[in-house]
Amino acid sequence: MKKNATIVYTIKRSFVKSDISILEALDYNVFQIQSPPKKTVLAFVINRIKEKIKSIYYVSRSKILIIWFNDYHAFIPILFSKLFLKKSVIVVGGYDAIVDEQNQHGLFFNTGLRSILAKINYSLVSEIWVVHKSLEKGCSYAKEKFNIISGV
């Protein structure tokens, strides 16, 4: 019998497609929750409603929840993974692990709803995977040379 996995992402980039292919090769049935970035309040709310409905259905049936990047789209699926006692993973790519004051860049540059949710997400997931080791503990070169704080 096939195992189920749920993958959450904003845009279906090549690395997301690769992960889906890898999971399918490992005999997983892959449920997908795509939550594209939207600028209007209505579209934002509709995305959250879709995430809730899909999370209830998909996460409850999955062995694992995998989320590409930490942002709004991660919060609701993570809550349902906790509710259904499922393993959850966030894959951190950079923006969601840095503060670059000079360029005013990074999820934690501003202290608003996004950064608050991101901190909550990091505290709730089972595991945090980084795409590069410098995102785990932070990059000392980036800190010294450019005053960029990184790391989860």
Q: What spans do the regions from the language model cover?
A:
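N-terminal subdomain of nucleotide-sugar transferases
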Residues: 1-37, 60, 127
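Nucleotide-sugar donor phosphate/pyrophosphate-binding loop at the beta->alpha transition
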Residues: 46-50, 98-120, 144
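A short, charged, and often flexible helix/loop element on the N-terminal side
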Residues: 31-54, 67, 104-109
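Short N-terminal targeting/anchoring amphipathic segment
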Residues: 55-74, 86-90, 127
